[in-house]
Every structure is written in structure tokens, then in C-alpha cells.
């Protein structure tokens, strides 16, 4: 038998696995995970929501990575800004897609307006005023 002799529940056994098992969340900065996080931000997910996904680092760890890795911080800022801009365009599309002449046209319009307002509120909350271009407007 090859492998390392380990003790498990008082019994000596050989560990024959060649690759160590990954346990817990990733703590070291990983370019692949960072890219996945940035892409999830571009889809509108918050860092807190991402941290709850399996295999993702904790919210605190992502905040630390932003502090330590400028490219990660900039990627999140850009994708967040782009998502906000896209949310504005999507709000207009939602209203345009309503068929006013349909039997339930007014009901569709009210639902579309509510959805568009929610999208615009989310974009405003994400603050389009703070762009990653460095030209913040007050």
C-alpha cells in the first residue's frame, strides 16, 4: 500500500488519495474565482449574495481581496457600473414590450412600470453617480 499512514478513530489506515481534499471556502486569492465573482456582479448579484453560493469566499474575504487586489476592485466597480447602465436600458425595454391594445393592457402596463421602477431604484442604489472612470459627479 502506498500513501501516508494516518490514524482514524483509533485505527491506523493508509491515506491513498493523491490530491488533498478541499475543505471550507477559498481563503487565498484565486484569479479564476475572482473572475467568476466579477461576472456574477455583472449579472446583478451582490457580493453578499455571491458569498452565500457554494464554493465562493466569504463576504469579508471578498472585501479584503478588493483592498489587496486593485484589478479585482476595478473589475467589480466596472461591472457594477455596467449593470446599472444596462438596468436603465432594460427598464425602457420592459415598458416598450407592453401591448397596450391587449385585453389586459393596462394591467400589463402597471406591472411593467412597477418592474421598471424597481430596476431603476436598484441602479440608483448602486449609484450611477460614482463611475469607475474617475469622474464622480455630485
From Swiss-Prot:
Residues 1-27 are annotated as: Disordered. It holds the Pfam family Sf6_terminase. InterPro entries: Sf6_terminase. This is Uncharacterized protein YffO. It comes from Escherichia coli (strain K12). The lineage of its organism: Bacteria, Pseudomonadati, Pseudomonadota, Gammaproteobacteria, Enterobacterales.
Amino acid at each position: 500500500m502506498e500513501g501516508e499512514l494516518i490514524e482514524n478513530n483509533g485505527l491506523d489506515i493508509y491515506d491513498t488519495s493523491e490530491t488533498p481534499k478541499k475543505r471550507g471556502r477559498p481563503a487565498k486569492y484565486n484569479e479564476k474565482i475572482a473572475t467568476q465573482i466579477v461576472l456574477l456582479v455583472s449579472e446583478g448579484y451582490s457580493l453578499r449574495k455571491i458569498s452565500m453560493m457554494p464554493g465562493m469566499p466569504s463576504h469579508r474575504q471578498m472585501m479584503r481581496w478588493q483592498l489587496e487586489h486593485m484589478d479585482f476592485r476595478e473589475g467589480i466597480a466596472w461591472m457594477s457600473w455596467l449593470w446599472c447602465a444596462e438596468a436603465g436600458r432594460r427598464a425602457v425595454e420592459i415598458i416598450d414590450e407592453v401591448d397596450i391594445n391587449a385585453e389586459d393592457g393596462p394591467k400589463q402596463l402597471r406591472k411593467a412600470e412597477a418592474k421598471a421602477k424597481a430596476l431603476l431604484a436598484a441602479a440608483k442604489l448602486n449609484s450611477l453617480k460614482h463611475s469607475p472612470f474617475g469622474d464622480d459627479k455630485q
